[in-house]
Amino acid sequence: TYPDDLDVVANGTAGEFDSALNVQQQQYDIPAVPAHDGMGPTAAAQVHGTAQEPYLPASIAPAVLAILGLTNYAPFAAHPTHTPKGVTSSNSPAPTTTYTGNLTPADFATNYDLNPLYRDGITGKGETLGVVTLAGFDPATAEYFWNNVLHITTGAGRITVDNVDGGPGAPSEKAGSGESDLDVEQSGALAPDASIVVYQAPNTDYGFADAFFTAASQNLADTLSSSWGESETILLASVDADQEDPAY
């Protein structure tokens, strides 16, 4: 149970949950998906889940928004696009850089008129950025990007990694760690003096929810962001197709 009592973690066997929630969990074989539309291939997998909606007694059902964790299916995926080799960066003390033919934090700062803030010395000092991700993150990757690609000065030890529910495992491009790197690198470049807390969780529905509950309970981050998931348009279409629970 989290301090706010809004997220309650329950433990038990599959049979106990089947009995308590009136469901029947089964094993499902997910076929492999070949590469298509610029997205990499997905390997075949075996997952567990249930086709039935969980049931709760009428005395407590109105207070429960959703029951998560009856499946370990991981539908979220990251599809990063790699920058071609040979790009160059300029050596500058400002939180910016220049690539050839690619958008950068400097472009974001210009388009959203952040440069006046930098000139006034507002660079995130004393603030904390929170990033939620579902793939392993290595702080050394972001530090290399800031120091050797953007050539900006950042504070030592500015990144804290919080493994929610045991974490997602070791960093892996296949699992989407490139997306984790991107989130931290870009936000940290725009606010070079801010601290960063990375909440990394297993790639499951309950892992995603627990990461946000953990961040809210700790109340350390001044802002919290995540690039995992789908847009509202896609989510609503999934709900209409009974592929997604509207409560989730």
State where each predicted segment sits.
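Substrate-binding/charge-relay-adjacent region of secreted/lumenal peptidase catalytic domains
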Residues: 1-4, 9-248
